[in-house]
Amino acid sequence: EAVRKRAEEVGALVIVDEAYHYFYSKTFLKEALAVPNVVVLRTFSKLMSLAAVRLGVIIGNPELIGYVRNARLTFDANSIALLFAERLMNRPDVIDGLIRTQQEGKDGLLAELDKMGYWCRDCRGNFIFIKPRHNAHEVSDRLEKMNVLVHPYGNQLLKDFIRVSTGSKTAMSTT
């Protein structure tokens, strides 16, 4: 609220990235629809594991949306991606099923890692942070040789952790 008010005072735009909105129930949609300087960005790629689709939505004041529309490329999304999104938005049962499947896989992985004594952080997305027992970059390199891709970090706050993307129980148990 304080950020929104300050942005309004100075005429700035507040952009809320809700890329992981399927995994976290709090949203700024009401603000984006009611407050002229707030927009929400969402993507379809996180829940569907379709990063290559590169399709998302922007929700906000019609005037701001108009500026975005004027600045975008003529063919900024392919027709298959648009059809996919349109059909998906009309199938909340499919979305709910994907959320459930994703959560079951994440919960199973967290339970197994807890049994093995690892410190993990359940994040509000399709990933978790794990503190490995050895250097995070070395662990990442060893896992990559086994065709398991995780993401180590270089910054001071996260250098001791690896980020592991999560999926269905089947996907999480094949490694």
Where are these regions (language model features)?
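Active-site pre-lysine segment of PLP-dependent enzymes
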Residues: E1-L47
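PLP-dependent aminotransferase class I/II
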Residues: N37-D114, Y118-R121
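PLP-dependent enzyme catalytic core of the Aspartate aminotransferase-like
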Residues: K5, R142-H151, N155-T175
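Conserved PLP-binding catalytic core of the aspartate aminotransferase-like
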Residues: Q103, E112-M146, I162
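Short acidic/glycine-enriched loop/turn segments that link adjacent beta-strands
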Residues: A52, R124, L157-D160
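Short beta-strand-to-loop capping motifs
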Residues: G60, I130-H134, T166-S168
